[in-house]
């Protein structure tokens, strides 16, 4: 018979037993014949009956084509070239952090130009380091003479975008956007107009669940919007540069 009806939301399967004795549980999601006939209109919960995923459906859309983590050791002012699974020549954002030293977090991208950095742990305005990251390639990135001291271990998080940026007029403020609609990630730059209710196009084609904002020209914070941050996410934002929430 029907155990439940009218349920909504996300489902998680679990099994629990009370007591100190041990039990073995076997789950049958369709890998074996069912003991009873499934109700009309229902299918086994298995990969074959799930929708084809947008990410990972083919070798060209594997998740590591859109996001990668690179662990590297700096060669100092000699610079170096480091491999990645992301085609950074087609637009990317790189988030850099020294692991073996106390350093800031540095963000750079293809839209602003890879010599321009912002630090997520400070309120500082954009800085320019023309000899730090010198190239975003199709399967690697290159550092120059402004890289960390030789021997420093570093982590770089990399997100794929889509090009060096194109004009977007979807909002009341014109923006420059590099958007990967398949992976749901975009880089957006714009010039604010100090007008309440102004809108900015992001190029994704769907409502984003999260975004991070930082002024490039002013020493300001890093407000972070997330759809599930609290009951009023538009005003209940987080700030990257501090260790407490800003609800």
What name fits each language-model region?
Residues 2-247:
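Surface-exposed molecular-recognition determinants
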């Amino acid at each position: 018979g029907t155990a439940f009806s009218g349920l909504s939301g996300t489902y998680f399967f679990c099994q629990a037993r009370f007591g100190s004795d041990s039990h073995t549980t076997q789950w049958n999601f369709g890998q074996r014949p069912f003991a009873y006939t499934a109700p009309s209109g229902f299918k086994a919960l298995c990969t074959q009956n799930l929708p084809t995923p947008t990410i990972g459906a083919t070798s060209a859309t594997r998740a590591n084509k859109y996001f990668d983590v690179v662990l590297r050791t700096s060669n100092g002012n000699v610079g170096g070239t480091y491999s990645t699974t992301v085609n950074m020549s087609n637009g990317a954002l790189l988030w850099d952090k020294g692991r073996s030293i106390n350093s800031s977090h540095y963000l750079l991208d293809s839209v602003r130009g890879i010599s321009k950095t912002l630090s997520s742990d400070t309120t500082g305005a954009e800085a320019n380091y023309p000899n730090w990251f010198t190239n975003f390639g199709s399967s690697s990135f290159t550092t120059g003479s402004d890289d960390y001291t030789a021997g420093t271990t570093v982590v770089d998080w990399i997100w794929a975008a889509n090009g060096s940026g194109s004009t977007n007029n979807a909002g009341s403020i014109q923006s420059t956007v590099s958007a990967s609609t398949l992976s749901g990630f975009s880089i957006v730059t714009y010039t604010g107009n100090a007008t309440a209710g102004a809108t900015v196009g992001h190029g994704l084609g769907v409502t984003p669940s999260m975004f991070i904002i930082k002024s490039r020209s002013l020493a300001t914070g890093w407000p972070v919007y997330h759809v599930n941050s609290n009951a009023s996410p538009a005003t209940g934002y987080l700030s990257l540069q501090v260790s407490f929430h800003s609800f």
